[in-house]
């Protein structure tokens, strides 16, 4: 099963990912934790370029191509092999961040972003995306693979809800969906 976490910085993604991984391991699952950009040696090198304050003049098209290169390596080297081995992969961010940051944030054409992302991932989408810290109204606009979690509660309450959602999806997962960002 491939699970991704999205949400603004400071929404508790890292904490919730760690707690979910601990719980899944206690349930007997093999879990791989990863992040984007990064997740592989090549991806981490690209992450360094993307996050270098010296590169503030980076063109938006250059940025999306670098993120996509990192993602392509991530999928090929880590995510697909882990899925094939029956592991649960939990990623701190994935392709949905591309629409938010490069699409809405940097003004790139959403259809172009979808096409580039589909090429980079070979169409691989998560079975479940957990999005922290959005309103219920925004959450209703998502697809059925999204689980909107109210992150304004205690860490324990948020984790309990995440566990409930993941438990319900285990065994019902759809690993390879058409790309609908």
Positions of predicted regions on the chain:
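Structural signal for short hydrophobic segments within the conserved structured cores
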Residues: 32, 65, 128, 147-149
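Conserved lysine of the Walker
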Residues: 13
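Hydrophobic positions on the alpha1 helix immediately C-terminal to the Walker A/P-loop
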Residues: 16
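Hydrophobic anchor at the beta1->P-loop junction of P-loop NTPases
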Residues: 3-5
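NTP-dependent small-molecule kinase module
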Residues: 19-21, 137-181
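ATP-dependent small-molecule kinase phosphotransfer cores
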Residues: 29-121, 161
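Walker A (P-loop) phosphate-binding loop of P-loop NTPases
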Residues: 10
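Conserved phosphate-donor/acceptor-positioning beta-strand/loop module used by diverse small-molecule
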Residues: 91-93, 114, 122-139
């Amino acid at each position: 099963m491939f699970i991704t976490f999205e949400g603004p910085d400071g929404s508790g993604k890292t904490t919730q990912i760690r707690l979910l991984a601990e719980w899944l391991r206690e349930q007997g699952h093999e879990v791989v934790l990863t992040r984007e950009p990064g997740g592989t040696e090549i991806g981490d090198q690209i992450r360094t370029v993307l996050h270098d304050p010296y590169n503030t003049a980076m063109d938006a098209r250059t940025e999306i191509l670098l993120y996509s290169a990192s993602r392509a390596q991530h999928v090929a080297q880590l995510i697909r092999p882990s899925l094939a081995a029956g592991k649960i992969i939990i990623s701190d961010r994935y392709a949905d961040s591309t629409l938010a940051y490069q699409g809405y944030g940097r003004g790139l054409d959403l259809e172009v972003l979808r096409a580039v992302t589909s090429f980079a991932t070979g169409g691989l989408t998560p079975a479940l995306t957990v999005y922290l810290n959005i309103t219920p109204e925004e959450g209703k606009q998502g697809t059925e693979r999204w689980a909107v979690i109210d992150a304004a509660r205690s860490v324990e309450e948020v984790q309990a809800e995440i566990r409930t959602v993941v438990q319900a999806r285990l065994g019902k997962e759809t690993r390879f969906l058409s790309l609908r960002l």
